[in-house]
Amino acid sequence: MIVIEQILSKQDVGAYRQQLAECPWGDGRKTAMGMAASVKNNNQADAQHANVRQLANQLLARIGETPKIVSAALPHKIFPPCFNRYNETEEYGYHVDAAIMRIPNTSEVIRSDVSMTVFLSEPEEYDGGELVIATEFGQQQIKLPAGYAVVYPSSSLHKVTAVTRGQRIAAITWMQSMVADVTLRQTLYQLDQSIQNLIKANNTDRAELDNLHNVYHNLIRQFTQL
């Protein structure tokens, strides 16, 4: 589980919220697969609406140009982002994301390796509505500032708790990673982040940094699937 700080600025969030307020919304259960439909109770912006498609494309572009997301997920394919809304009493019970997803209006499918939530509501705007992810270390609760995101393995059992006050708006998407194995992907992320931190510190011999870069990229060559 990795937090991405300010993938969207406050101004971006305001623009997204304004446009989403003018878009049609429907019952989120219509897009749920299998057992997830029975525990899903939220609303989802109409993915076919022109404004929703435009926002989704803008977010796709932002994902691709955010180095920390690229490092953490090593995305090969990205599902078009969806926008969901939880009003008071609405929730999404424990579920696991579908392993295979078909991209709407295409014949293309992706394997969901990495899930991402981008928060579009400030924490003080609503009570409840925490994203809860079951991990080997217990339940992890996430409630981040608007514009922040969290990425986590799609294999994780997770839920969104009931909103008891206000409204929770977020964007969600899924990625097929070039590295399917979650442990290997996390190790590559840690290595890359260590290299980036050494570069920022500016006190490491250039030859050593070149060697580390060489190791990282050769591991990428060895383990990625395209």
From Swiss-Prot:
<keyword id="KW-0847">Vitamin C</keyword>
<dbReference type="InterPro" id="IPR006620">
    <property type="entry name" value="Pro_4_hyd_alph"/>
</dbReference>
<feature type="binding site">
    <location>
        <position position="95"/>
    </location>
    <ligand>
        <name>Fe cation</name>
    </ligand>
</feature>
<dbReference type="Pfam" id="PF18331">
    <property type="entry name" value="PKHD_C"/>
</dbReference>
<feature type="binding site">
    <location>
        <position position="168"/>
    </location>
    <ligand>
        <name>2-oxoglutarate</name>
    </ligand>
</feature>
<feature type="binding site">
    <location>
        <position position="158"/>
    </location>
    <ligand>
        <name>Fe cation</name>
    </ligand>
</feature>
<dbReference type="InterPro" id="IPR044862">
    <property type="entry name" value="Pro_4_hyd_alph_FE2OG_OXY"/>
</dbReference>
<keyword id="KW-0408">Iron</keyword>
<dbReference type="InterPro" id="IPR041097">
    <property type="entry name" value="PKHD_C"/>
</dbReference>
<keyword id="KW-0479">Metal-binding</keyword>
<feature type="domain" description="Fe2OG dioxygenase">
    <location>
        <begin position="77"/>
        <end position="177"/>
    </location>
</feature>
<dbReference type="GO" id="GO:0016706">
    <property type="term" value="F:2-oxoglutarate-dependent dioxygenase activity"/>
</dbReference>
<dbReference type="Pfam" id="PF13640">
    <property type="entry name" value="2OG-FeII_Oxy_3"/>
</dbReference>
<dbReference type="GO" id="GO:0006879">
    <property type="term" value="P:intracellular iron ion homeostasis"/>
</dbReference>
<protein>
    <recommendedName>
        <fullName>PKHD-type hydroxylase Sfri_0612</fullName>
        <ecNumber>1.14.11.-</ecNumber>
    </recommendedName>
</protein>
<dbReference type="InterPro" id="IPR023550">
    <property type="entry name" value="PKHD_hydroxylase"/>
</dbReference>
<keyword id="KW-0223">Dioxygenase</keyword>
<dbReference type="GO" id="GO:0005506">
    <property type="term" value="F:iron ion binding"/>
</dbReference>
<dbReference type="GO" id="GO:0031418">
    <property type="term" value="F:L-ascorbic acid binding"/>
</dbReference>
<feature type="binding site">
    <location>
        <position position="97"/>
    </location>
    <ligand>
        <name>Fe cation</name>
    </ligand>
</feature>
<dbReference type="GO" id="GO:0006974">
    <property type="term" value="P:DNA damage response"/>
</dbReference>
<dbReference type="InterPro" id="IPR005123">
    <property type="entry name" value="Oxoglu/Fe-dep_dioxygenase_dom"/>
</dbReference>
<keyword id="KW-0560">Oxidoreductase</keyword>
